Design a protein with these regions (language model features):
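Basic, helix-initiating cap at the start of DNA-binding domains
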Residues: 1-35, 41-48, 65
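C-terminal peripheral helix-coil segments that are non-catalytic and often amphipathic
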Residues: 1-8, 105-106, 137, 141-148, ...
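An amphipathic alpha-helix adjacent to DNA-recognition modules
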Residues: 18-26, 38-39, 50, 58-83, ...
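Key DNA-contact positions within bacterial/archaeal DNA-binding proteins
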Residues: 54
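Short helix-capping/turn signature of helix-turn-helix
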Residues: 60, 117-123
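Hydrophobic alpha-helical connector segments
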Residues: 69, 83-112, 160-164, 189
Length: 207
């Protein structure tokens, strides 16, 4: 599924169309997170977005259509947040630590991420797979390059990427989502950096 926004018939959107589509996606994020997929409805989404039902169908074909597009949208934005944060690092361990911090900030701003991705397991399994495949794709490339450069220990970059994603997802769930925090404390982030450094075989704790 493409990350480029289009109308339901595949035509490029105007700036106004992009804004309307964004409003609908933000409304869908809130409605699906609060009510769950089965209790959510197009009526509730359009009411939350402040647009008519006819407008909805210019951008999405169905409730499942907007759900699938929402998964793609959240995936794109969380990857962007992590990449931008990680780009400030100068070593792989530093990049990992900063990338995780970017992920936790995104989770604090968008707690619906967890609820919607978990719903995808039952509503749209193919979108669940797409979400994680897109997360790991660039991650694997970066880890492989770090291994080839001798910056981290050699190993299976795909296995390492999935293991690190598991750490980030569960730490974010426990200490951001469940605890209602905006971010991990500096002390916890430092400790997590040391755990990651040991996991990837780097002598640098990310600080």
């Amino acid at each position: 599924m493409s990350e480029t926004a289009t109308s339901v018939d595949g035509r490029p959107l105007s700036k106004r169309g992009e804004r309307t589509r964004r409003k609908l996606l933000e409304a869908a994020e809130a409605v699906f997170a609060e009510l769950g997929y089965h209790d959510a409805s197009i009526v509730k989404i359009t009411e939350a977005a402040g647009v008519g039902q006819g407008t909805f169908y210019l951008y999405f074909a169905s409730k499942k259509g907007v759900f699938d597009e929402l998964v793609v949208d959240l995936n794109h934005r969380v990857r962007q947040a992590m990449t931008e944060a990680a780009s400030q690092g100068t070593t792989r361990a530093e990049m990992e630590r900063l990338g995780f911090a970017g992920y936790f900030r995104f989770v604090a701003d968008h707690p619906a991420l967890y609820r919607i991705i978990r719903q995808a397991e039952f509503v749209s399994p193919e979108m669940l797979h797409l979400h994680y495949e897109r997360l790991t794709s660039g991650y694997v490339t970066g880890l492989r390059q770090a291994m080839e450069a001798g910056e981290i220990a050699e190993g299976d970059p795909e296995l390492l990427a999935w293991a690190l994603m598991g750490i980030g997802e569960l730490v974010g769930m426990r200490w951001i989502l469940w605890a209602g925090r905006d971010e991990l404390s500096p002390e916890m982030l430092d400790e997590l950096g040391r755990i990651i450094a040991r996991t990837i075989g780097s002598g640098n704790g990310g600080r």
